[in-house]
Structures are given as C-alpha cells and as structure tokens.
Swiss-Prot record:
Belongs to the NADH:flavin oxidoreductase/NADH oxidase family. Its cofactor is FMN. It is an enzyme of class 1 (oxidoreductase). It comes from the Eukaryota. This is Putative 12-oxophytodienoate reductase 2. Putative oxophytodienoate reductase that may be involved in the biosynthesis or metabolism of oxylipin signaling molecules. The keyword ATP-binding does not apply.
Amino acid sequence: MVHAPAKEAIPLLTPYKMGQLELSHRVVLAPLTRCRSYGHVPQPHAAVYYSQRATNGGLLIAEATVISPTAQGYPDTPGIYTQQQIEAWKPIVDAVHRKGALFFLQIWHVGRVSTTDFQPNGQAPISSTDKQITPDDSGMVYSKPRRLRTDEIPQIVDDFRRAARNAIESGFDGVEIHGAHGYLLDQFMKDSANDRTDEYGGNLENRCRFAVEVIDAVVAEVGAHRVGIRLSPFDNYMDCFDSNPVALGSYMVQQLNKHPGFLYCHMVEPGMAIVEGRRKITHGLLPFRKQFNGTFIAAGGYDREEGNKVVADGYADLVAYGRLFLANPDLPRRFELDAPLNRYDRSTFYTQDPVVGYTDYPFLEEIDEESTTTYA
C-alpha cells in the first residue's frame, strides 16, 4: 500500500526554533511513565523505545524520573540521583541523538503519591500536608504522608538541582521540571493539598514559593536555555486541585518570565467537552500562552486535526502527544501521510515487559509489508 503525503499544509510538520534549538516539526513525545527501569535503573530496552520515536529535529521528553530515594511512588521508574543511573542513561541518550533528535529529561518527586513500601526504611512519604489521598476506584491506597518541616525544603530543592546537573552529565539537552498532576510541587501549589501555616502555605505566592525555588535552583545550575516545566493548573488529580487555577497558572508564568530565555512552558488542557457528539479540547490555556515569553507546549488529548489547528492559530508552538506516540513510533510520518494509527493497548502501559506494549508497536512500513504479503 502506498501512502501519498496529505495535500493540505500541515502546521504540525513545519520547522520551529525553540531558543537556540532547531526543530524540524512540532510533534513532541510527552513524558510517559512506563515502569520498565528495573530497580530504578534505566535499561537497554529504553534505547530501542526512545530511538524508535526519534526523528531528525524532533523533540522527545523522557519519562518522569525520580530525583531521590524519597521521590519514588511507582514500581521500576527510573532515577537520576546515583552514578549508576547517570551512566545507564548515557547510551539511551546517545541512541536518540544518533537519530538527530533532541532529548529532555523530566525530573520528578511524587510527594504523597506513594506508599511506605517505596520509601527508604519504610518511612512515610513526604508532602506539603499530612492529609492522605482519598482511595480511588482502583483500590489503590496511598500511605498517610508526613508534612515536610520548613527546614527540610531546601534539601528537596537541592535534590532537583542535582538531578538537573546529573541529567546534563548523562547527555540530555535539558530538563523538564515536573510541576503537574498532583505530585510534590503541585501539592504545594494547590490550595486543596496545601494547608501549611509557614511561608510555604496560605496565599498564592507562598504556595508557589517551593516551585519557584526549584525553578531558580535548576536555572542557576544548568541555564534557563536548558529548562522547561510542566504545569497543570486545572488538573484535579490525586486530590490536588486549586480554587483559582487561572490565577495559579498566571502567577507561575510570571515567575518563569523572570528568567530570560526560560526555554518552554508545557501545560495540560483543562479537559474535554462534547460538541456535536465529538470530543473537543476546551482550549483553556490561552491566557497563559499570551503571557509566557518562551515556547509554549500544549498537551491533553490532541489528535492530528486539533494539533494542526492550535499550531496554525498560534495557540501553541508545539503539541505533546502521549498515548498516540506510545502506540505509533512513527507518529510524525503518519501525520504527514494522514495514515491510520495503531490503537494503544492500555493494559500494557505499566507492565514490566521490555518488548510487549513497549517496542513492538509496528511502523507504517511494517503494516504495509504485511498487507501485501501473499502466502502459498
């Protein structure tokens, strides 16, 4: 089967200059937890997975990677705090760079989204609060957290700083600070999860202080031109939401703008609406896009049509794709040809298999070869 390139202009596939970095297209691999880094050490199969999704001039954001032993909350997620982990990332980064792609590492602390099983010496997870996450429908029960003391916070800030330095040592082109989805920085920023009475709680400025200190430290360590952040002000995930998400997002963007050359702001859409029977992205990020001085990346359920539209309209510079990129290693090529997409298998998202649901999703050419094969 021969696929002809789509005739209409494809905004997602136009070049873009992000700071001093030249991108050949706007389709970004979103950071996706895959739980295949055994013992929290990146494995050789990750080099296959990421290089499959790498294109010349493309941007990949690696899966959320823990910054310290207390940052863990899921099985077999990678770390970036030991020399063994730093060395293990190097061949993975090299494999991506050989394809001509840019590679950023998302640095992460889960906070209270953890259990004592994942914590050093079985201690309680740390958070902005001592309030436990309400058990969800899956039956997962997270341990009751311990509220961080004020004098402990500088150590966590330094853990982020060292993680950024280690990422650059591994060869990454930069880092993305994980400030989204109900994890530690989000727990401090959002008023549903921050009930502190010290300088890290109360008003908006205080609640954002920890995240701002992390940003400042990481920028000072590796340079603003190597730093992005992911934020989800509208998110209600892991009992973590804010009473005024627009004010929260706007304040954080203002803090990013204080760092000339801060590379990108990666934000998650508020959600979906049903319009004429179709799921439509609500496009609630426009105020932040207008305020931010750097590259703006939008994420949250985008398909080819929606991605093209927001780039063409100037709503976003780049669009991050998660599940579609997971299931289609050649996603930019498929978008170019407007070709059918592989369906993702949710049951294999977080298994530990190094191949199934990880590196075995077929490329378009493989499907075409199968469809034209005849058997005697």
